[in-house]
């Protein structure tokens, strides 16, 4: 169920990485046309009290990009980047980051601490292995259907 915060956040990260990560067609096209740089980042916080997901980026076209991202999020279930093939790629990417992070005690300590529920960082390989596109879509619906989208634009001085 959705009570398992860690698994939920991993599946949500997979969905948003498919749509907005560097392997997505959307990111590639915005990057190639100079509308986005590599500063695009994704932050997810899922716990028993509140959930949030934050996309941050530098762009010269905040209104257009914001509109495009909002539409993509609303129509995530039919997004061309949300596919079995792309999910397999993202799963490998998440697993690679996991293996890499095992070299960092600090990372393990902070990650281990932030999820005191049933699963931990060490369950990640199993979560990745068992993750299906249907699971990802289900979590996506649960999160997006129950969320408000808020935009902040910070202009340089």
Question: What is the role of each PLM region?
Answer:
Residues 18, 72, 139-142:
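Generic, well-ordered alpha-helical scaffold segments in large soluble proteins
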Residues 137-140, 145-153:
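Bilobed periplasmic-binding protein-like "clamshell/Venus-flytrap" ligand-binding domains
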Residues 1-25:
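His/Glu-based metal-binding/catalytic segments typifying zinc-dependent metallopeptidases
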Residues 25-26, 138:
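Short Gly/charged-rich anion-binding patches and loops
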Residues 1-2, 27-78, 85-130, 148-156:
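M16 family metallopeptidases and their MPP-like homologs
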């Amino acid at each position: 169920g959705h009570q398992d915060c860690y698994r939920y956040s991993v599946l949500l990260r997979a969905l948003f990485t498919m749509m907005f990560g560097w392997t997505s067609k959307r990111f590639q096209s915005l990057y190639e046309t100079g509308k986005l740089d590599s500063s695009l980042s994704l932050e997810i916080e899922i716990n028993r009290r509140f959930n949030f997901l934050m996309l941050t980026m530098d762009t010269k076209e905040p209104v257009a990009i914001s509109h495009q991202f909002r539409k993509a999020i609303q129509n995530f279930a039919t997004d061309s980047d949300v596919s079995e093939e792309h999910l397999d790629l993202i799963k490998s990417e998440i697993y690679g980051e996991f293996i890499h992070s095992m070299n960092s005690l600090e990372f393990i300590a902070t990650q281990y601490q932030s999820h005191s529920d049933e699963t931990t960082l060490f369950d990640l390989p199993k979560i990745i292995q068992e993750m299906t596109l249907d699971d990802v879509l289900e979590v996506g619906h649960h999160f997006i259907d129950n969320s408000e989208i808020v935009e902040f634009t910070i202009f340089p001085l």
